[in-house]
Curated annotation (Swiss-Prot):
A biological-process GO annotation: translation
Free-text function comment from the UniProt entry: Forms part of the ribosomal stalk which helps the ribosome interact with GTP-bound translation factors.
GO molecular function, one term: large ribosomal subunit rRNA binding
Keyword NADP: no
Protein known as: Large ribosomal subunit protein uL11
PTM comment, free text: One or more lysine residues are methylated.
InterPro entries: Ribosomal_uL11, Ribosomal_uL11_bac-typ, Ribosomal_uL11_C, Ribosomal_uL11_C_sf, Ribosomal_uL11_CS, Ribosomal_uL11_N, Ribosomal_uL11_N_sf
């Protein structure tokens, strides 16, 4: 018989840097889960990733106070800012000059990485979604 699920916890934690301090500790403590065990397992699962990369994680809490978790790919904004080599997007999109630029080939690479977590039917659709995200962040999309 399957375990009874009592809830889900969605967090975004830097790769390899999970620790019991907020936001991890309070979120898991409310569900009665072993915080240190999660931190050890998460850090082990993300040690191959670039340190500090934001990793979305969905933690499933069970009635017997055990858990399982699924890591997802980092957010689109992380990849777009990294491709454009900028720290953050434009605070006033459309009013000021673009803060950076990304090429269509960079968008295609990001789309291939993110495709499993995106709500798109094909790679071209995912590229268009990323182009829209880039424009809303104040990045210019160029051919190439």
């Amino acid at each position: 018989m399957a375990k009874k699920i009592v809830g889900y916890v969605k967090l975004q934690i830097p790769a390899g840097k999970a620790n019991p301090s907020p936001p991890v500790g309070p979120a898991l403590g409310q569900r009665g889960l072993n915080i240190m065990q999660f931190c050890k397992e998460f850090n082990a699962a993300t040690q191959a990733m670039e340190p500090g990369m934001p990793v979305p994680v969905v933690i499933t809490a069970y009635a017997d106070r055990t858990f399982s978790f699924i890591t997802k790919t980092p957010p689109n904004t992380y990849f777009l800012l990294k491709a454009a080599k900028v720290q953050k997007g434009s605070p006033t999109v459309g009013k000021s000059a673009a803060v950076g630029r990304v090429t269509m080939s960079q968008l295609r690479e990001i789309a291939e990485t993110k495709f499993q977590d995106m709500n798109a039917n094909d790679i071209d659709g995912a590229v268009r979604m990323l182009a829209g995200s880039a424009k809303s962040m104040g990045l210019t999309v160029v051919e190439g």
